Structure formats: C-alpha cells, structure tokens
C-alpha cells in the first residue's frame, strides 16, 4: 500500500486524476494492470476504484440509491449488484444512513458513501484521495481498518498531506512537491 504524501498544492490530487485517467498528462503515461491509461482509459478504469477528493454523489439520492446506480453503470446484474452493494455497505458501515438523502449526511458519512462507490465493484486497484478527510477519530479508525483489510488483496494508493495517515496504514511512501517526486521508500 503506497502513501502519496506532500504539502497542500504539491500535485497529489492532480497526479491521482492522471493515474485514474480523469486528467490527461501533458507528457508520459501510467500503466494500470498493463493497460495504458492514456490510450484505453475506460478499459483501465474497469479494474480500479477511485475515491476522489470531493467524492461524486447526487445529493438528492440516498446512499442505497446511489450504490444501486453505480452498480448499474458498472454493468453488474441484479444479484451481483445486491451482493456487491451489501459488501460495500458492510465495509463502510453505512447501515444507519442508507435511506437518508446524501445531502443531509455529515461529511464523514458522505466520505464513506464515496468509499463505498469506489469499492462496490471489487476492483483490483484502489486509488483514494484523502480517504479519511472529514472523519471523526472513530470513523478514521474504522476506515483505516477497512483499508488495511482490503490491502491484503488489492493494490492501494492513498494521497494525503498527513504523515500520521501514511504511518498508520501504508507500507511504502512517496513524497512529492510541485509535481515532482522528492523521496520514495519504506
């Protein structure tokens, strides 16, 4: 599990957008499971889950409706979608808020809805931008535990400007500043 560290404005979120194919780099590329993200972004994105900094969600939908929508656009049949949504809900502990409109949820629960959409299709690769941003201490502990559990079977990259976050859950770290790698290691 790689922790992508750097101060605010270092280029972490921009780099994450390029790795996931949502922003085309001016030069270079990234290979996702051997697939060039610049040449075949949709194919590469099939094997990854992405939690952007401001996780997309329709505010008038409930978490249940949103996850149903995400499983449909991911092409899961009804039985697989139900099972996938149940697994994502369990992992993100959303049971108590499933039928509340997303715009009424706390920032922490909205963040968990974003995480649930990133993992609902059980991707091989998980890329998360500030995954514990806005979470209270208990929620941070729960989400960190879930991330550690997922890291047993997935390649994971998280970005943060908080060293404690990387220290708590990552096995490797990369520090960038102004879009350039400063140091990398364990």
Annotate the PLM regions:
Residues 1-177, 182-183:
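ABC transporter nucleotide-binding domains
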